[in-house]
Amino acid sequence: MVMLTCHLNDGDTWLFLWLFTAFVVAVLGLLLLHYRAVHGTEKTKCAKCKSNRNTTVDYVYMSHGDNGDYVYMN
């Protein structure tokens, strides 16, 4: 009878651990990108604010317009 055991000195085990770790990091990275892209009405850094002379704020509120584009509001 063959026992299915796994030792940490086995090359296949380390390969699986590296691939699993890379998969988890990739999923977490995609979740972070999704979170940052989807959340409208969040405070975000606005480079256009410094070029606008009517405002002195560094951050603006951002929301989606009717056509899906971002609308910047103070």
Swiss-Prot record:
Keywords: Early protein. It comes from the Viruses. It holds the Pfam family DUF5472. InterPro entries: DUF5472. This is Probable protein E5B. It comes from Human papillomavirus 11.
